[in-house]
Amino acid sequence: MIDVKDLSENPDKFRASQRARGADESVVDAIISADSDRRAALIRHETLRAEQNAFGKKVAQAKGEEKQALLAEVKELANSVKAASAEAAAAQAKQEELLRVIPNLVVDGVPEGGEDDYVVLKTVGTPREFTDFEPKDHLEIGELIGAIDMERGAKVSGSRFYFLRGVGARLEMALLQMAMEQAIDAGFVPMITPTLVRPETMQGTGFDVKHDAEIYRLAEDDLYLVGTSEVALAGYHADEILDLSAGPIRYAGQSSCYRREAGSHGKDTRGIIRVHQFNKVEMFIYTTVEEAAAEHERLLAWEEEMLAKCELPYRVIDTAAGDLGMSAARKFDCEAWVPTQNAYRELTSTSNCTTFQARRLNIRERVINDEGVAKGTRAVATLNGTLATTRWIVAILEHHQNPDGSVNVPKALQKYLGGLEVLPVL
């Protein structure tokens, strides 16, 4: 949720943000109008309430016919107060409805445009050239080494489901363990998070539970399956006042994640690039507004550290405004090279959500002045970033493959696989 006061005082920057996203600018003026209506309705209600209280004192002192006349006026005034209260509540609801629609304010420097308008910030490593043999794709390799079984995944659960077995299961567990250990070393608190959340938690994080076709819902229980542990970690401190005096609060959540992939018909139908269920280690940070940008850079650095450990060539992109999603004010993606696709594919994403999620979830910090005296509260900033996920297996298998289909294990991962240096062909 955006800051209404900031929007009212600086409407042009919010209009510019909407333009950068390719979104409707008129919502800015609609919110300003709704806020004006809300304020006017509230003033009317408070004025009538004051009159009602004053009349109460007059009635108490009056006698006879005067009292009867005043009682009639009090009754009429009570009806007016009730109507004004309903008007104020309706105006408040209208404003809140509009605030649920407008996305976060993008920060300065974010590229304008849509999915293809990203800016490449840097490229690290060189895509492997296969001069001696034709590279196999990750599914063919996964079947050769007994790591991936798509056929039985489809038999059991349907399309875009799979089994990781043998070295495939071990490789994913190794990746997640290495990621979690790195996070712990960086000061993150490890968390195993719920994968089912209430609608208010999903909405508070920035998802539209009514219209988002990507979300699985358990209608009977009114619970939603998360597509990332970011949702549960964001809701963890809902309606709380945090102490950030000692620095950011950092959590690393591990969970299964679920996505319907409703808009992906025909895309990435082979293998495990785009699936309905996967596992992930997600970093999540609560910090001050002033520290948010620096924390965003740190999250990116931790993601790059993991990519380096896996010895993968990659690039970092600054995602364009129209591809940010509801909550993000800025997002960096790390994309690893996938040889058989001759393309970079996203492995990590890190977003600075500024105060957007915190306002929705009512997460605040206490403001202390220079004299050490508390001066109220304000919204915190939240950030998130992927540290490892099932999709990494795609890039690892393809980039580190040998002519026979076996796969060299990146050195940093070997200790998590019992010293295994090569994933052999069965």
From Swiss-Prot:
UniProt xrefs under PROSITE patterns: AA_TRNA_LIGASE_II
A Pfam match: Seryl_tRNA_N
InterPro entries: aa-tRNA-synt_IIb, aa-tRNA-synth_II, aa-tRNA-synth_II/BPL/LPL, Ser-tRNA-ligase_type_1, Ser-tRNA-synth_1_N, SerRS_1_N_sf, SerRS_core, tRNA-bd_arm
EC code: 6.1.1.11
Keyword terms of this UniProt record: Aminoacyl-tRNA synthetase, ATP-binding, Cytoplasm, Ligase, Nucleotide-binding, Protein biosynthesis
Taxonomic superkingdom: Bacteria
Molecular functions (GO terms): ATP binding; serine-tRNA ligase activity
Subcellular location: Cytoplasm
A GO biological process held by the record: seryl-tRNA aminoacylation
Catalytic activity: tRNA(Ser) + L-serine + ATP = L-seryl-tRNA(Ser) + AMP + diphosphate + H(+); tRNA(Sec) + L-serine + ATP = L-seryl-tRNA(Sec) + AMP + diphosphate + H(+)
Assembly with partners or alone: Homodimer. The tRNA molecule binds across the dimer.
Family indicated by similarity: Belongs to the class-II aminoacyl-tRNA synthetase family. Type-1 seryl-tRNA synthetase subfamily.
Domain observations: Consists of two distinct domains, a catalytic core and a N-terminal extension that is involved in tRNA binding.
Protein name per the record: Serine--tRNA ligase
Species for this entry: Paenarthrobacter aurescens (strain TC1)
Gene name of the encoded protein: serS
